Amino acid sequence: MQNTSGLQMTTLNDILDMRNRAKYATDTGTKMHKKLQHVVIDNGIEQGDATLISQIKNNPEILRFFNRAAKTEVPLAGVVSGKFVSRRIDRLCIDDKHKHIDIIDYKTDVNRDAFYALYVAQVREYVMLLGMIYPEYKIDAYILWTHDFSLEKIGLK
């Protein structure tokens, strides 16, 4: 809404609407994370939400991250760029035999651009922290966009 001087005005209803949308987005993301946390698809075993299992099975690129060896909601803390950070990795796959780690961070946003820079920075922090723990391992990081189950590899430079 604009006032008579042409300035944009925000009404209480606008503020409440934005707050409700943010709460809805947060609640939706939390529910999706909890559902994905329990999904396992490995050697004939299927555990978790049937709809999610179906979506994951239809995408071989994603399927490999949902085996029994994958860890979920993994706490991680350390110092990055002189600042203490405490994080939680959504899905972590460590292959000790090949010295390789995959990090998967779930994002429920439909508009990828809104917080993209923050998401990339967050994933890069995971990589830096894990790199301190596993300096001899190759680490790949991904964002799994849950609205369309697309997987995006994050560049680490």
Language model feature labels by segment:
Residues 83-157:
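Mg2+/Mn2+-dependent nuclease catalytic core
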Residues 1-89, 95, 119-121:
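Nuclease catalytic cores
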